[in-house]
Amino acid sequence: DNIFIYTLQQFLSALLWICGLHGDNITGAVTNVFTNQWIADNNTAFMAGTAVKDLPYVWTPNLCRLSQWVSSCWPILVYMFMSSKKLPHLKPLATICLPPAVFCIIEPIMFGLPVVMNGFLLVPFILTHTLTGAFTYWLTSIGFVGKMYMNLPWATPSPILGYLAAGGSIGGAVVVFINFAIGMVIFYPFWKSYEKAEVAKMNGGAA
């Protein structure tokens, strides 16, 4: 349970997703062996009277839900709506993708846009996963985000999960929106390049 291994796991997960593979499931086959035990230990410690900030482990199964998709697929979804005037086909796709995205079901965005194998979006996708993952781990380690001791369903909307899983951590909800804002900034120039290329393609190659 350390920030360097966690950040590496987030990087590898994003890299696998870009290649069309389920990065969470693949890396989780190794890490879940540890993180499931760690959240159980956190729960045991909490029930014994340990304060949330003093729980033994930062890295728990759902820690990534506070960063990875809210900093990548949520910004992509927003930009899909924003670009729908220039690229009309994006609006119905974004509308379909919105309800599942609220519950961290991101396959419609990953394979529908697609983000997978997308040369314009692969760099910010990997970057946001990695940076916000490390940032969230650090904020949890210093106590801004409460350490999780309840293993809620993975599809719980991220702000709610961050708040409830640590027994009412306001920081756990706030960090979701911070990571979303970070993702919006990182994705912006890459999305504009993607939008320009798609408009040119739609216009038959004209600039």
Predicted features and spans:
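Helix-loop-helix junctions within the multi-pass membrane cores of secondary transporters/permeases
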Residues: 38-121, 125, 129
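Pore- and pathway-forming membrane helices of multi-pass small-molecule/ion transporters and channels
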Residues: 29-38, 69-76, 97-103, 144-165
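Hydrophobic alpha-helical segments of membrane proteins
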Residues: 7, 11, 19, 26-29, ...
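Hydrophobic alpha-helical transmembrane segments
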Residues: 2-25, 51-72, 162-185
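Transmembrane alpha-helix interface/packing and boundary motifs in multi-pass membrane proteins
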Residues: 11-24, 33-36, 100-103, 108
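Transmembrane alpha-helical segments and their short flanking loops
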Residues: 43-49, 110-207
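Flexible hinge motifs at transmembrane-helix junctions and intramembrane kinks/re-entrant loops
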Residues: 1, 17-28, 190-205
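Helix-loop-helix
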Residues: 4, 31-38, 184, 188-195
